[in-house]
Amino acid sequence: MIGPTKKPQDFGFKDGDTHLIVNDITEVMTAYDFHGNKRWEIPCLARGQGSDTDWKHPRTDTPPGLYKLGAVYDDYGKVGLHAACDRTHLAYGWCSFDMVSLDHHEEDAGRAGIMMHGGGSGCGWPGAWAPKQHLVPTFGCVRAYNSDLRDKILPLTKKGTVFVSVFQEG
């Protein structure tokens, strides 16, 4: 497994913050609080359009490394369950979060624009807007169920900093 070279503690990890660990092999995201207590696990993908060990090219797997969640886009909060089909809703689902690279693995791989989101154009409409849409590979982002992003990740962003460690096959 290849993962981050730094830890959340290197960036001021404190009480109220959360550490999400994304394992592309097991397709699971696990949340831990500041004290190391496991909060929950949810299904997710960190899978792109290339081979299982490629994250250095556009549209391939999420680059391994340490990120923090940045800007939050709560489309579900704006339009609710019965949204009209549009490209953003189709591709990104209910909620999306910018992922800010902290250990520069994203930049070192020549990548940019990595996010965590739901949706999935491959699910069609209204499938991409379903609470538990089919998890299809992305162009390099972390994808989780729409309902998990709204109910589990979004509240964490209101409590503190959310750090994300992405682990990939080597």
Model-derived regions, located:
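A general sequence property marking short-to-moderate contiguous segments
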Residues: 1-7
